[in-house]
């Protein structure tokens, strides 16, 4: 197959940041993607509908005039989140989901939830009104090994929550383990999972072998090869419970290349080329559209995009920038460590 035309894709987990960084990165997403769920872990975080409305306005202001893009806003769940504010945000069409960050799990998550019981009133309201909960599925207790955080979260937090509120719709974001894949597959309704581009490509060796490579460090951290293969199998299967959420997370290089570097990989520039490569490798190009364009909208109760994009296989490797320059500073672009031959040749 030398070309493929699919419905315009969506990104169901994206970090756009704010200010100069927002202005520097948004076009890399909006050029190709029609919609994206926008993460709320700013400083300060997006905790109220008023915060979300103001942030949405800043995103739209930064959008290039020729781009058609819809930011889907989320709220950062805290132990003090107002159920009424959440419901009003949902009813107004402003809020697509609420995001659960266990305190300390990732970038700017120190204000997240420490005691799930204190968040139950808003979770109960969300279950009642049908508003999805997006979860960063890791525990942060110091006695749990970082590579086991996801599996322990499923057993100690997610499964008890779903048993208590079976009607709550939960997206397990950036699944990184076979444990997560198996748990989603075994669930009966109201559970789905997003998978990132980079977790389909790298395992933990990318971070550690041959020296510390900070631009492959993310949270959840990449796992063993058997987990990567389980993610690939899920992504290319066509199973409607799995869809793309890039978790593309820009940080300026000085904050990555230091003694205590930030977690996050910036994949927005070359995600579709990387994914076409992965699906071609797996003999599943015909299921790429389901993963990037169909399964996510179906899960979130939205219609798939009518616009199309075309990817073409080039004879010579496609050259992407090694880094982009933003007003906040340089940001390194994800290097999949293999040549990319697929290129988006016709945008929507």
Curated annotation (Swiss-Prot):
What EC class is this?
hydrolase
Q: Where is the active site?
A: 247
Q: Which UniProt keywords apply?
A: Hydrolase, Metal-binding, Pyrimidine biosynthesis, Zinc
Cofactor note from UniProt?
Binds 2 Zn(2+) ions per subunit.
Q: Which residues are listed for Zn(2+) 2 binding in this entry?
A: 99, 136, 174
Q: Which reaction does it catalyse?
A: (S)-dihydroorotate + H2O = N-carbamoyl-L-aspartate + H(+)
**Protein function:** Catalyzes the reversible cyclization of carbamoyl aspartate to dihydroorotate.
What is this protein identified as?
Dihydroorotase
Q: Which gene encodes it?
A: pyrC
